[in-house]
Curated annotation (Swiss-Prot):
The keyword Ribonucleoprotein applies. The keyword Acyltransferase does not apply. One of its GO terms (cellular component) is cytosolic large ribosomal subunit. HAMAP family: Ribosomal_bL27. InterPro entries: Ribosomal_bL27, Ribosomal_bL27_CS. It comes from the Bacteria. Gene3D superfamilies: 2.40.50.100. This is Large ribosomal subunit protein bL27. Residues 1-21 are annotated as: Disordered. Belongs to the bacterial ribosomal protein bL27 family.
Length: 91
């Protein structure tokens, strides 16, 4: 009768899945209205022109166009969307 005493229990062994945070559309990339630009905890990036902020601080486009990141004198980085018609006019 080969027996083995039971091993002790461990208090480790739990971990939560990663939250998939970060920049989803980088500077110069095209984005549609409603598209997510940044998923973040807190305000690492702030909403600029044509960008809205959700209750979990997610930044999303309010207009179709190109994403642009701007650091202003207040030391905040703002995500802005240059509307598609303005992008065409600049070219």
């Amino acid at each position: 009768m080969a027996h083995k005493k039971s091993g002790g229990s461990s208090r480790n062994g739990r971990d939560s899945a990663g939250r998939r945070l970060g920049v989803k559309k980088f500077g110069g990339e095209a984005i549609n209205a409603g598209g997510i630009i940044v998923r973040q905890r807190g305000t690492k990036f702030w909403p600029g022109e044509n960008v809205g902020m959700g209750k979990d601080h997610t930044l999303f486009a309010l207009a179709t166009g190109a994403v642009k990141f701007v650091t202003k004198r207040d030391n905040r980085t703002y995500a802005t969307v240059v509307p598609a018609n303005e992008v065409m006019a600049a070219e």
